[in-house]
């Protein structure tokens, strides 16, 4: 994990509160920025930080496995090499999402890209896109997509 800040003793209570506030604000911005594009390159974090390395590892595992509809959190845990509770704590802390939400949101973001490309090319239907990104039930895909983006896949294609 690592330290985000340190204070020398004796410390001023106001200084402690200011540091905590800054850390929480930075974490919130980090989560918000990551949740928008799910890209670690856009994050303003030291390249050698443990958080950036962890997110890069998590992203590479999901990128390698997202098409597999059987890829679940248990597989994610095994590939990342940490316990379920630690994985969920780190994912929640860094991205504001559980490991399962992270996988699903990655798939949904890819599906959105495919739908937008498909709007022009018209080479795939919604079910094919759902299968392409690792969903094995197009109806479940549509429910998740609609909940995540507040628009149905079909209406995204029509606009």
PLM features per residue range, with description:
Residues 7-9:
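A Lys-centered signature of the CheY-like receiver
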Residues 21-37:
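The C-terminal output helix
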Residues 11-20:
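C-terminal output helix
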Residues 39-56, 60, 64-70:
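Regulatory hinge/linker segments at domain boundaries
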Residues 93-136, 158-159:
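Terminal helix-turn-helix DNA-binding modules in bacterial transcription factors
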